[in-house]
Amino acid sequence: MLTLKIAVYIVVAFFVAIFVFGFLSNDPARNPGRRDLE
């Protein structure tokens, strides 16, 4: 099932992007001046 494999890759890439974004932004909760997630 090529469609299933593509869907899995999209989900994995989505979570990895969220993890990398949170890591690079150094937890927005610690930066009161940045409210990107609110």
Curated annotation (Swiss-Prot):
The chain crosses the membrane at residues 4-24. It is found in: Cellular thylakoid membrane. GO terms for biological process: photosynthesis. The keyword Transferase does not apply. It is a single-pass membrane protein. Pfam families: PsbI. One of the components of the core complex of photosystem II (PSII), required for its stability and/or assembly. PSII is a light-driven water:plastoquinone oxidoreductase that uses light energy to abstract electrons from H(2)O, generating O(2) and a proton gradient subsequently used for ATP formation. It consists of a core antenna complex that captures photons, and an electron transfer chain that converts photonic excitation into a charge separation. PANTHER family: PHOTOSYSTEM II REACTION CENTER PROTEIN I. Belongs to the PsbI family. This is Photosystem II reaction center protein I. It comes from Nostoc sp. (strain PCC 7120 / SAG 25.82 / UTEX 2576).
